[in-house]
Structures are given as C-alpha cells and as structure tokens.
Amino acid sequence: MSGTRILVTGGAGYIGSHTVRLLREQGYDVWIYDNLSVGHAEAVAGRQLIVGDLADRTTLHAAFEQQQFAAVVHFAGVASVGESMREPLIYYRQNVANTLALLEVMARHQVRKLVVSSSCTIYGIPTETPILETSVPNPVSPYGRSKLIIEWMLEDCAAAWGLGFVALRYFNAAGAQRDGTLGEDHTPESHLIPLALQVAAGQRPHLDLFGTDYPTPDGSCIRDYVHVEDLARAHLAALEHIQPGEKLFCNLATGRGWSVKEVVRLCEQVTGLGIRTIEQPRRPGDPPHLVAAVNTARTVLGWEPRYVDLREIIETAWHWHRTHPRGYSHS
C-alpha cells in the first residue's frame, strides 16, 4: 500500500508518533490530525500536520474533502484511569463524542477502513488469566467504559454501512524509539516507568506505590508491558489486513506480567540509582492483575512482540529520558 494516503488522529502523541514514523518509513502518505493538547509537533517534525480538534467537524470535514484519505488510524483521546474516575464526563466527551464525530465524517466521505486504539481496561477485573479477546468485558472505570462504547459503535457502523475496523486492545505501553529520538512526554506524567525514571534522575522526590495489599505475590498490581515500537508494528499490520465490512479485536501485549515492585527494581538495576517509594492506598478502578493472551494478533495479523524482556524495554525508556530529560521542547 505504498503511497496510500492515511489520516492518523492523535498522531503527535506517544504511540501515534511512533506509528507515524513507521508508516512513513513503509511508504505511506501520512497526514496527522492533532490538537496538540498532549501531543508534540516536534515528534512528527511538523510534517503534514493539521492542528485541529475532532469536535471541530468543519476542519475535520475539510481535511477529508481535500486529502481523500483511504483509511484512518485513530489514536486521539484521553487515557488515564485515575483521571476518568474524577472527571468522567471528559472521557465520554473526548473519547466517545469525538469518535462519533470522526465516524460521521468517515461515513460521509465513504472511508471504510479504520484502525482504532482500544484498551485492556475494557475487561475490568478479569475472571480468567491470561485474558482472551472473548473474555467478557466488564470495565470498572469511565475510561474503560468509554473504550467499550467505542467498540460497540464500531460494530454498529460495520453492520450499517460496511465499516471495516481493527480494534487494538493495548495493555501497558512502555519504552521509546531505540535510537532515542522519540519517547514518552506527558504533562502531567502518570505512567509507572517514566515516573520511576524521573525519581532515579532526581526530578521527583519519590514514587507513590498505589496499593500494596492486592492478592498478588508481593501485594502490588501486576501488568503486561508492551513496547511502543511493537505497538506501532501492530498498527501497520492491522492497516494492511483490514477490509471494508470486516471487524477484528486484538489484544496487544507480551503475555507476561510484572508487578509494580518488580518494575521499580528493574528501573533501579537499569539506571544504577535508587528509587525512593512511598506506599499509598489503592486507586479506584485499578484491577489487581492484567495479563493478556495474544493469539489473535499472532495468527491473524502475523504480529509478535519483539521486545519480550522488560529490562530491555526500560533501557530504551532510560535512553530517551537521559537524552530528553524534560521531553521534546526543553531537552
């Protein structure tokens, strides 16, 4: 599909920018639609960047009218379980309503191929491990519910007007581009690995451990971490697989779980620096254990994670952090 024109919403964000780079390397003509509220123009070198919000249907329609996109990769949205518990309406507006706006414009312009960012949070507190795509969704946070509503919308659009889609259910994205030119830069930061690395680098006084009484071997939550470059490769595979009217749901993970305390110890080993931690109460909406089966991505998309050692994932994140201690704009 070299030369195919693609729209990537939220393409200046963490996972989006890594995917944009890979798609461009593969010959796709990539246009980015991003309001830059959390994304960074520097991450995409400002190339073919439309600064706009999905809620602005006029700007969105004009982009489709002018560029004649063949497919869309949809990253735009907000993604914090904790914040969604405090501000649920933000999540229904930014995730659900804005995806609705995108789908309306896609339908109007007869664009029937979509790869969308979903989330492991749709599963809630799983009743089986590893989690399969057929596991019953039961989200426990507004963020997870917003992602499940989006999946329902996609299924209805597939039935009504032939939308073809792949919904990629990420587990915990981590790491950075191996060459250190792209990485994680959130304000405020909420992800475990960059927070731990900031403590190691002396940029934060301590790391909060939210919940140490979970039913896990060391009492801390267990998560399945997947490298951001592997996520980008999965989006490429999904884009090349998708056909109008077809639907696919895929977990993206490594299939191995790591506890919060294990992650902190690995960060200390990678950096050679101590990380002070303070135990805090559990956060609402945090399941104790999330580990995935990735058989669907493997058998249907031909995707395998290349980064299966969490230490190696953390090493790429540390390389980014050392070369960009204050992110893109202030390194």
Can you annotate each of these PLM segments?
Residues 55, 76-79, 91, 188, ...:
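Glycosyltransferase donor-binding loop in the core domain
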Residues 1-176:
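N-terminal Rossmann-like NAD(P)+-binding domain of SDR-like oxidoreductases, especially those catalyzing
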Residues 41, 171-192, 202-223:
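Short, flexible, glycine-rich and Lys/Arg-enriched loop motifs at helix boundaries
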Residues 195-331:
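C-terminal substrate-binding subdomain of Rossmann-fold SDR/epimerase-dehydratase oxidoreductases
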Residues 41, 49, 86, 90, ...:
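Short capping/connector residues at structural and topological boundaries
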